[in-house]
Structures are given as structure tokens and as C-alpha cells.
Amino acid sequence: MKRVTLLLLIFITYLPAQQMDRLFWNGSDWRRLEKLADYDPELTYMMKIAYINGILDGRLFYYLKAWMIEQTFADSLYAETVDYLTPRELVKVLDNFYADPINGYIPLPSAIIISNMFGERIPMDTIDEYIRHSKEWINRMILEQK
């Protein structure tokens, strides 16, 4: 009986953490991974790689689901290149991107697109425009929630 109670207590404790929307993690969440990994660089790197691979796998999954229904729509919806950089390069670029406090509240999916834009050598005007739109979008979304 004590084991069941203990397992139930652990499950209830971790349940709210599972409900957290990790899709909208931003720079503060990205930087917090170091603290969660107890400042171990290898563990921090593995956690960041796992997050990036999860986002890319999820994107591929939903692209393929949409592609089965309507190929043209799926191709236009998922037109951004998010796999130009390797995951290792992407971690480095994201670390540098979030080192600037101004970029701290841009969601990670947008930061991944921006990082790949840097890697593809897209003109800075276009990248700055995308960053501005990302900031406006997240600001609108935050204000609508309140």
C-alpha cells in the first residue's frame, strides 16, 4: 500500500510539469537547461539536442500528415528550412542568439528558423524583418492571454 501511495504521490507531483507547453519555450527556458543539468556541459548539450530533435521530429510528423491530405498545402505551410544546420551547429547558434537579452522572449521554434536563416546567409534585412514579426506575434499572443 505504501508503494502505491508513493507512486501516486510522485505521479501527481510530476503531472503539472508534463502539462507545460514546451513548444513556446523561449531564451530563458533555453538558458535554464544549464541549471537543470547542474552546469554539466555534456548533459546540457544532450538536453538541448533532445529538445531540438523533438521539435524537428514533430514538425516532420505533421508535415507528412498534411502531405498525405494535400501535398501543395503541406509544401507551402512547411516551406521554411529548419534543417539546414546540423543539431550540433544549431545548439551553438541558438546559444549565441539567446546570449542577447533582447532575443530572450522569442520562442524556440522561431529562433530555430532564424538560426537556419543565418546559416543559409539570407540577407540581414530579411532576418531582421522575421525577428521583428516574431516579437510582434509573441507580444500580441501574450497580451491576448491577459
Show which residues each predicted segment covers.
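Compact alpha-helical subdomains of small soluble proteins
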Residues: 19-28, 61-146
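Immediate post-signal-peptide N-terminus of mature secreted/exported proteins
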Residues: 18-53
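Sec-dependent N-terminal signal peptides
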Residues: 4-13
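Extracytoplasmic/secreted envelope proteins and their assembly/folding machinery
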Residues: 48-59, 91-95
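Enrichment for repetitive, rod-forming helical segments
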Residues: 9-10, 55, 66
